[in-house]
Amino acid sequence: MRRIPEPFRIKMVEPIKQTTGAERRAALEAAGWNPFLLLAEDVYIDLLTDSGTGAMSDRQWAGIMMGDEAYAGSRNFVELERAVREIFGYQHVMPTHQGRGAEQILFPELVKRCQGKAPVFISNYHFDTTKAHVELAGARAINLLTPKALDTTAPYAWKGDFDLPRLSDTIETLGDDNVAGIIITVTCNSAGGQPVSMANMEAVAELARRHHIPVVIDAARFAENAWFIKERDPAYAKCSIKEIVRQMFALGDIFTMSAKKDGLVNIGGLCCFKEDLELFRAVQVRCVAMEGFVTYGGLAGRDMAALAIGLREGMDEEYLTYRISQVAYLGERLAEAGIPIQTPTGGHAVFVDAKKLLPHIPAEQFPAHALACELYLEGGVRGVEIGSLLLGRDPATGKQEAADFELLRLTIPRRVYTRDHMDYVADCLIAVKARASDIRGLTFDYEPPLLRHFTARLKPV
């Protein structure tokens, strides 16, 4: 992969501090062996998430100083609406406080429209909050990821794709009336930040149209997905990122977005509709009740100003090349040391295959979460589990489900860390690998009923 140096100058820095091994153990025990509950000041390199943790540009900060905090009709909303229409081609724009805000106001309305008695949403892979909001809306989440993604060693280019034969069979089996929507997650986070090909998106959209099912694009990492299409599909090699984005979104009816990823902001989301004014108005009612007035949706005007700028900056090809090559570099360091990862590396994170690194820990003892804890103990690096802990229990039986993947996600914030930081992370994980056979699994001390991985407290087995 072509590598370029950081395509920016650093104008402001924030000190970070190293801690001792004893301090880290005390902090992790106080947090109930859950990295989510650690204090940020006790973390040296924070790879928990790329959501809202990036650095904004000087132009975005200038936009913040021009914030129009009018309750209704803010100038910054008009700027954001203009940016969305220009970039995505969707006419009806609704800001939300973040991506889950869009999900909580959209999904109940799609379920209401569903004519069947057993509504479902089908996705390549629902992320955690998406699945939670599907279930809160009274529906069931079905994941139909390509089986090629399950082999983390296979160098398949499009591991975020839908399994198209299973998608067709599932719709036929359940019936059109029971499918409230098809959600295309780009990139596919839970599979390793893996891209969805344009051909796969086109096939999904065609199938949905044939069955009169709305297509929802979960657009958190839309620009990274477009970059992969340009890089890996010869048919799009000469297209601009903007052109690819327009073609991707022409295949959807609605998109939700956590703008805290490719929108390059610290807070914000979007719920946008290509042309369905009736649905847009129904969702607006929920927005006013749950998010805020329809021209701010829980955001300050200054945040909308930063987002309007960030959406454009996030599609810059030079920036995206730097961004994705930084992820690839960390992946290469780990792979060279014999640490199993999801290959090829995705757009926003390196995903370590804990099932292979810690084969002695069963799924119900959460091997990827145990690995996350050990990485923190080793060097103060905070990652996050994407596996059975996140997946949760079967809502019908209450039994722990075994996830398809047991992955440690090392999520790289945008425009924050340098190559030296990546080398430090790699060195820490290599040290953990040397004692992998000594790592123990974890069990619950406290288990919340929903989205348990955020606030659960655990203890070593």
Swiss-Prot record:
Post-translational modification N6-(pyridoxal phosphate)lysine, affected residues: 261
A Pfam family this chain is assigned to: Beta_elim_lyase
Gene3D superfamilies xrefs: Aspartate Aminotransferase, domain 1, Type I PLP-dependent aspartate aminotransferase-like (Major domain)
Cofactors required: pyridoxal 5'-phosphate
Molecular-function annotations in GO: tryptophanase activity
EC number(s) stated in the UniProt entry for this protein: 4.1.99.1
Catalysed conversion reaction: L-tryptophan + H2O = indole + pyruvate + NH4(+)
Pathway listed: Amino-acid degradation; L-tryptophan degradation via pyruvate pathway; indole and pyruvate from L-tryptophan: step 1/1
InterPro entries per the UniProt record, alphabetical: ArAA_b-elim_lyase/Thr_aldolase (IPR001597), Beta-eliminating_lyase (IPR011166), PyrdxlP-dep_Trfase (IPR015424), PyrdxlP-dep_Trfase_major (IPR015421), PyrdxlP-dep_Trfase_small (IPR015422), TNase (IPR013440)
Enzyme class: lyase
This protein's UniProt keywords: Lyase, Pyridoxal phosphate, Tryptophan catabolism
HAMAP family, alphabetized: Tryptophanase
Family: Belongs to the beta-eliminating lyase family.
Subunit organization: Homotetramer.
Matches recorded under NCBIfam families: PRK13238.1 (NF009709)
Protein name as annotated: Tryptophanase
Name of the gene encoding the protein in the UniProt record: tnaA
